[in-house]
Curated annotation (Swiss-Prot):
Species the sequence originates in: Salmonella typhi
Gene3D superfamilies, A to Z: Ureohydrolase domain
Protein name stated in the entry: Formimidoylglutamase
SUPFAM superfamilies: Arginase/deacetylase (SSF52768)
GO molecular function per UniProt: agmatinase activity; formimidoylglutamase activity; manganese ion binding
Amino acid sequence: MTQWYPASPALWQGRDDSIEAPDARRLFQTVTRSEAFFPENWQQKIALMGFACDEGVKRNSGRPGAAGGPDALRKALANMASHQGHERLVDLGNWVAPTPDLEGAQQALRDAVSRCLRAGMRTLVMGGGHETAFGHGAGVLDAFAQESVGIINLDAHLDLRQTDRATSGTPFRQLAQLCDAQSRAFHYACFGVSRAANTQALWREAQWRNVTVVEDLDCHDALAQMTQFIDKVDKIYLTIDLDVLPVWEMPAVSAPAALGVPLIQVLRLIEPVCRSGKLQAADLVEFNPRFDEDGAAARVAARLGWQIAHWWR
């Protein structure tokens, strides 16, 4: 059974510069850490949650270790400067999945996300493998059942695989099937896709599903496509698989990208999403601290989370 645990206060530590000025503060001083999962107490805040699960990565023959991602990212965030938007972050702890119950873990995350959104919060989830996306996305669909939900994925992989059970490579096929079951449109855009990492069958599935696909080679000039996708939906769920970044910026993932999309381009693509007023949920997935020797990759991932919270409108 999936268990919920509050985040350890030891993760939120940093240098205290408050003697310099009242606003010389860092995230460890402005993030609120909750000892109970009760989102109804935190309306209009951003729920920071961890999904400590890499069972989907294991099933997908990937490199395990992403279950340690949420706490590693908290530590990297803690000492970053606190600016506008960061005071809204409330740490609502981790959902910890026992092996091999991926499906139960995804259901627990789905229920938690839906509860947060219905309570008036927004959700920022730290994975975990990209199996995070099915639980997170399903929770968003549940919370906004009468509105069109757009799923924006920055990822080297389409993650539309067809297998006999859920993995880190199946979440968007699962979400498509959920939309089919609910008789609603499946709005999915994937930016940063590597043609070399996706079979022809996956490209065919994306075409059949009317997925907006932008290859890694074309992301330098993709703002118009991003804006067009934003404009056609009511609510947005943004998911960032860190393997969209090039290996020299992000080696600490299950499947490092030989080419990838540089961090600065990723930031330029997500800025209009964050500022759109439509973003309800976001996540960072696939960070694997086992392959981050000096903490540099954690800081790269944390900068993405920092920027999302700062830009979020």
